[in-house]
Amino acid sequence: MAEQDTLVMPIAEMARSNDKFREVVWTGDNSQLVLMAIPEGGEIGGETHDGHDQLLYFVDGMGKAKIGDKEMDISAGDVAIVPSGKYHNFKNTGTGMMRLYTTYSPPEHEPGTEHDTKADAEADPNED
């Protein structure tokens, strides 16, 4: 899917039908909207975004969130807030796909980025 030029979209529905590890939906000057899907037993991968705040909105599945030194259960309907510079990781501990949409401020990924799998994301030279 190409980036959207529409400013209103059914994002929860889009997230529930997404099977890609990462798909950038919209990129603005100061923020970015991204769909993600984490397979059963998978994880986003521990990381820190210096200079980027991130909000993650979970629409399907369940898992564990680690933000800083705190670990919490997450499930559909939850939001996780990750301030700039804070270590974080999200693991799918349920059955089936864990799906979410996330916002970055400012943008974190190249506009139009798509990764079918986490391995694709790790192999992308534009990802750090």
Predicted regions and their residues:
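A generic "binding-loop/recognition-motif" signal
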Residues: 31, 40, 51, 70, ...
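Conserved short histidine dyad/triad with adjacent acidic residue
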Residues: 19, 34-49
